[in-house]
Design a protein with these regions (language model features):
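An aromatic- and glycine-enriched ligand-binding surface/loop that stacks and positions planar moieties
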Residues: 209-211, 355-356, 360, 773, ...
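Switch/connector loops and helix/strand junctions flanking conserved nucleotide-binding motifs
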Residues: 92-93, 187-189, 208-209, 223-225, ...
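Low-complexity intrinsically disordered tracts that form flexible linkers/tails across taxa
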Residues: 343-362, 763-769
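Acidic, glycine-rich flexible loop segments
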Residues: 245-265, 279-281, 352-405
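Extracellular/periplasmic, surface-exposed regions of secreted and cell-surface proteins
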Residues: 154, 280, 315-317, 321-340, ...
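Conserved small-residue
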Residues: 213-263, 514, 628, 738-815
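Acidic surface patches and DE-rich sequence motifs
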Residues: 11, 24, 34, 370-371, ...
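Short, small/polar-rich motifs associated with maturation and membrane association
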Residues: 1-319, 324-326, 331-333, 339, ...
Length: 815
């Protein structure tokens, strides 16, 4: 029998709570309060009501005819549980490791960022996020507590417990946790990488009345603080002075009487290549659920024009999340994601064909287009009479610059990727109080199609006399499985114990086909297909298979909410490493003392939490070793015929395998050890939060290619060896203040500071005389050899430039 109930929801100050959810528990029957906090609902006799609102603690009450309900402010931030990996969690105030927590993602998602990496920018001490050129498809770089590897500080992203899983949409993010110290990241072992671990928790299906939400964000982006190259007049004066000082004759191209445009500024190249980029994000989410069955469906569309001309990035994403409670012990969950990604990108960093670098070197006297025929401009004169008179097109004024607008407009680099991820979880809980078993299986399938057309380039200083099309597609299959047993319980109200045991396994393989075409008679966009190429060459390639297995254990103990100890251990077996050396152990230990809970600490409203903590841990960097390192790999099977696919009749694929690098049976992964000392302080009724940390991170067994005394005639590359050590020491400070002005207005202010000293403590290589050698990076840049090098005792990748005594300020100083 049903009945109609009425009621009013207010806060502790007696003010109405507008929009509070009132739900008949176990059903989808519900409503929300009006502007006066009132509600009316038809429910079953004896029904249980669930009343909730953001920022307030939820309540469950038996339905009555007339109800007055007072919601209290939610103090869950004090009891907020921070996910630490593999189902383990700990109250934020009880943490003994150094982690950064972002729970205000609803605010962060409205920032003008196009990636999850961008959401982290400026939010956490010791976490540095930098953009990768103006290309909208470029993923920002993340460095946590300093660079520790020559092979890149790759960060491991773990989404809902699955390493490497995609994030359907930034709007789907519920919280982000950054494991900054090795003690917290050690539970991920060699997968942690040199950069650290970022844990993302997404929104899930939940119980409640059907709800439909739509979020949209629009904005613009501009490149700021751009480099200001010399104008044409300044470039001409610089050339005149440099040649005069060297006692040389000025080239004809820099003689205004012969090349009349060389001293006239006609193009601001930075202004030409950059634009105001428009971006938009749309997200639609539908949630419906009961106590036993809940479903959430979301769709997202993101589009970013990019701040560089003729670039874009688009994402379409569909996600389904469902939870099915079969009985009081067993729950099955499913998370299914489909992502479609399209982009048009451009090289931004290469020494000659990087669009931004080219704009810096392109003379200001050049034009984007030749005014006579509309072709792409250079620095040669457009007047044929001058060329006829002087017999030159003044290539010496052009140098080796490339028209950057040609790179942006005529080069056609297009990428389309489609991927599907499915994660199925089985949870069996509380058959024994506190005991839970979780089994998870993830499968992913990815297809990519890539196309890059490079036209003929006729700039006199850096020509490219042939065109080409690179086209490849690949398929990636991967699976991961995890089985975890956890036990959490409290004894005698003082002894809290948490135990975790887990095993994981993963497998990865990629197969692809690459075809290159060249000598296109017509470069029109509708003819940029391999069938129009003069000739083609094809390659078949395989990456993997790669397999890894891990064993994990974790033990946490706390006494009387004052003393906290946590120990973890992980052993990784890596299929890509030599058999005799394919495993490693990654232990960690943390401790914390909550001084504010001691009997001798006076109770007051000023200091709410005072805690000191210490941690030590070890992690590895498996990503620094290629998938096929120890195995002979399939040769790139190829054919080259006149504009045809597949070998001619009677011809076969090449089908042998080979080792391209000398194998080192003792090779192991790069390893980092780090210790951390920290203080956490909450004051003024938890409105002020302060965290201070000092850390020392040592990365050793760095992986480098052996180049010293390696013979070039052996036919294979030098073996990889473990040598060298990098230290990062630093201090971090994180501070935030949150408060309410009234029931409708609140504010939050935060700031952070970090100082890091990076040093190569052991270079690993030695010169013939026994002195420490140097790492010289990846060669030169625009004919400048090794502009950055690494020496023992110096920071990683330091600039090595020509020393000067300063600039002459007057003719008298020159004399």
């Amino acid at each position: 029998q049903n009945k109609t109930i009425k009621g009013r929801v207010i806060d502790a100050n007696g003010e109405p709570v507008i929009g509070a959810s009132v739900l008949e528990k176990g059903t989808t029957n519900g409503t929300i309060t009006d502007v006066d906090g009132n509600f009316q609902l038809n429910v079953k006799e004896g029904a249980l009501l669930s009343i909730s609102y953001i920022g307030y603690a939820a309540q469950e009450l038996v339905a009555q005819a007339n109800m007055n309900i007072t919601l209290k402010e939610d103090t869950e931030l004090l009891d907020e549980v921070v996910v630490l990996g593999y189902g383990a969690g700990q109250r934020k105030q009880d943490l003994s490791a150094s982690v950064g927590v972002l729970s205000n993602t609803e605010d962060l998602v409205t920032r003008p960022v196009s990636s999850t990496e961008g959401m982290l920018q400026g939010q956490l001490a010791g976490v540095v996020v930098s953009s990768n050129g103006g290309d909208p498809t470029g993923t920002p770089n993340i460095v946590i507590r300093g660079q520790g590897s020559q092979n890149g500080d790759n960060v491991l992203w773990v989404v809902d417990g699955v390493p490497g899983a995609p994030i359907a949409s930034m709007n789907d993010i519920e919280s982000i946790v950054v494991l900054k110290d090795a003690a917290s990241a050690a539970i991920y072992g060699a997968q942690s990488g040199a950069g650290g671990v970022v844990l993302v928790t997404t929104k899930k299906a939940k119980e409640g009345a059907p709800s439909l939400s739509y979020d949209a964000t629009f904005g613009i982006r501009q490149a700021m603080n751009l480099i200001e190259p010399l104008n044409a007049e300044e470039q001409l004066k610089m050339r005149q002075l440099s040649y005069a000082n060297a006692g040389l004759s000025l080239p004809a191209g820099w003689d205004v009487s012969k090349n009349p445009w060389v001293g006239t500024t006609r193009t601001d190249w930075m202004d030409e290549i950059f634009r105001t980029g428009f971006y938009q994000r749309h997200n639609v989410a539908l949630n419906v659920g009961t106590e036993n069955y809940s479903n959430r469906l979301s769709f997202a569309f993101d589009q970013d024009e990019g701040v560089l001309e003729n670039t874009f990035d688009k994402h379409f994403t569909l996600r389904y999340n469902g939870k099915f409670k079969l009985n009081k012990w067993v729950t099955i969950s499913e998370d299914l994601i489909w992502k479609n990604h399209e982009d048009r990108s451009v090289d931004t960093n290469s020494g000659y064909t990087g669009a931004v670098i080219a704009a810096m070197f392109m003379p200001a006297s050049a034009t984007v287009y030749n005014p006579l025929d509309g072709t792409y401009g250079g620095t040669t004169t457009e007047d044929p009479a001058y060329i006829a008179q002087y017999g030159s097109n003044f290539a010496d004024a052009h140098g080796d610059a490339v028209n950057p607008m040609r790179l942006l407009e005529a080069h056609n680099r297009y990428d389309k990727t489609s991927e599907v991820w499915s994660t199925t979880s089985l949870e069996i809980a509380n058959i024994v109080p506190g005991l839970k078993f979780t089994s998870r299986f993830t499968y992913s399938l990815e297809h990519q199609n890539y196309k890059n057309f490079s036209p003929i380039r006729d700039e006199v200083g850096k020509p490219e006399l042939s065109n080409s099309l690179n086209n490849y597609s690949y398929r990636t299959d991967a699976w991961k499985t995890e089985n975890t047993l956890t036990y959490d319980n409290t004894f005698n109200d003082k002894h809290t114990v948490g135990v975790l045991l887990s095993t994981t396994a993963d497998h990865y393989a990629m197969r692809g086909l690459e075809v290159d075409g060249k000598d296109f008679a017509d470069e029109s966009s509708y003819l940029q297909y391999l069938s129009y190429a003069g000739s083609t060459t094809a390659y078949d390639f395989l990456t993997g298979p790669d397999a890894n297995v891990s064993l994990i254990g974790r033990l946490a103990y706390s006494y009387d909410d004052r003393y906290f100890l946590t120990a973890s251990w992980r052993r990784d077996y890596a299929g890509r490493l030599p058999k005799d050396n394919n495993y490693g152990d990654f232990p960690a230990l943390t401790a914390a003392w909550k001084i504010s809970n001691e009997a001798f600490f006076p109770e007051n409203d000023v200091v709410n939490l005072l805690k000191v903590r210490a941690s030590w841990g070890r992690v590895g960097n498996l990503g620094s070793i290629g998938y096929n390192y120890k195995s002979a790999v399939l040769k790139k099977s190829s054919w080259s015929e006149q504009a045809q696919y597949g070998p001619e009749s009677g011809k076969v694929w090449e089908n042998f395998v080979y080792n391209g690098v000398a194998l080192n049976p003792n090779l192991t992964w790069e390893t980092s050890e780090q210790w951390d000392l920290g203080i956490d302080l909450d004051m003024f009724n938890n409105r002020l939060n302060v965290a201070l940390d000092y850390f020392d991170k040592r990365t050793f067994n760095l992986i480098q290619e052996q180049t010293m005394n390696w013979p070039n005639t052996i036919g294979i590359s030098g073996m990889l060896v473990n040598q060298g050590e990098i230290r990062n020491r630093g201090f971090e400070a994180q501070m935030s203040w949150k408060d309410k002005i009234n029931k409708d207005w609140s504010y939050f202010v935060s700031g952070n500071f970090s100082y890091i000293k990076n040093k190569v403590s052991d270079i690993g290589v030695k010169n013939q005389d026994g002195t420490p050698g140097v790492w010289t990076g990846e060669g030169g840049f625009r004919n400048i050899p090794y502009i950055y090098q690494t020496a023992q005792g110096q920071p990683l990748n330091s600039f090595y430039l020509i020393k000067t005594d300063g600039l002459f300020q007057s003719d008298a100083e020159v004399a």
